[in-house]
């Protein structure tokens, strides 16, 4: 009877040791496997990362940029409101820039400058196209993302998203002039 108890105890001990070694090696193997797995990144996420580099602004809340790059044809959570806000930011940027240079600028001249920058065909759609927004903006399958109005809406929405993300319009204005800056010289000559 004592040998039977000893044998059972020895068997339990050996089985316990076997399982503890096998679970340790399993954990070690699992850890090695987990270390090799890279986080999934969608093409859209990659495009958003590239866009942040292009505009020189890193979003704290990437969902704002996602929304800015989402057209109304794609989702109810879209860029319409951000675009309206972005339009006002762009108009403020132009007004601030040109009133600071010439406080006596006529309202007609200032209005013309604002119109030039806000014009869908000749300005914001070109800037949006230059940033490659036609390949980034999410639209329904029946919608052409390279359409000027869609590019312009996305371009404007970026600045609305930046202002919300930064908590200040100043940052959005700074990024706007950085992105649009090469074309700003042409506007100055319009004065």
Curated annotation (Swiss-Prot):
Residues 1-29 form the signal peptide. It comes from the Eukaryota. One of its GO terms (cellular component) is peroxisome. The keyword Signal applies. This is Protein NUCLEAR FUSION DEFECTIVE 2. Keywords: Developmental protein, Karyogamy, Signal. Disruption phenotype: Failure of fusion of the polar nuclei during megagametogenesis. The keyword Signal applies. Required for karyogamy during female gametophyte development, when the two polar nuclei fuse to form the diploid central cell nucleus. InterPro entries: RNase_III_dom, RNase_III_sf. Residues 48-167 form the RNase III domain.
């Amino acid at each position: 009877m004592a040998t039977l108890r000893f044998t059972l105890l020895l068997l339990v001990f050996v089985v316990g040791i076997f399982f503890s070694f096998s679970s340790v090696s399993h954990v070690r193997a699992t850890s090695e496997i987990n270390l090799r797995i890279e986080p999934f990144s969608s093409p859209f996420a990659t495009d958003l990362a590239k866009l942040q580099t292009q505009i020189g602004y890193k979003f704290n809340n990437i969902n704002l940029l996602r929304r800015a790059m989402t057209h109304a044809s794609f989702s109810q959570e879209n860029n319409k409101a951000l675009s309206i806000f972005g339009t006002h930011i762009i108009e403020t940027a132009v007004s601030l820039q040109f009133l600071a240079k010439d406080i006596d600028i006529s309202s007609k001249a200032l209005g013309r400058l604002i119109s030039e920058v806000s014009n869908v065909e000749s300005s914001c759609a070109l800037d949006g196209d230059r940033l490659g927004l036609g390949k980034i903006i999410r639209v329904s399958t029946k919608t052409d993302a390279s359409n000027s109005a869609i590019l312009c809406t996305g371009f404007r929405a970026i600045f609305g998203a930046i202002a919300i993300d930064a908590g200040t319009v100043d940052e959005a204005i700074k990024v706007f002039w950085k992105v649009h800056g090469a074309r700003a010289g042409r506007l100055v000559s319009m004065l």
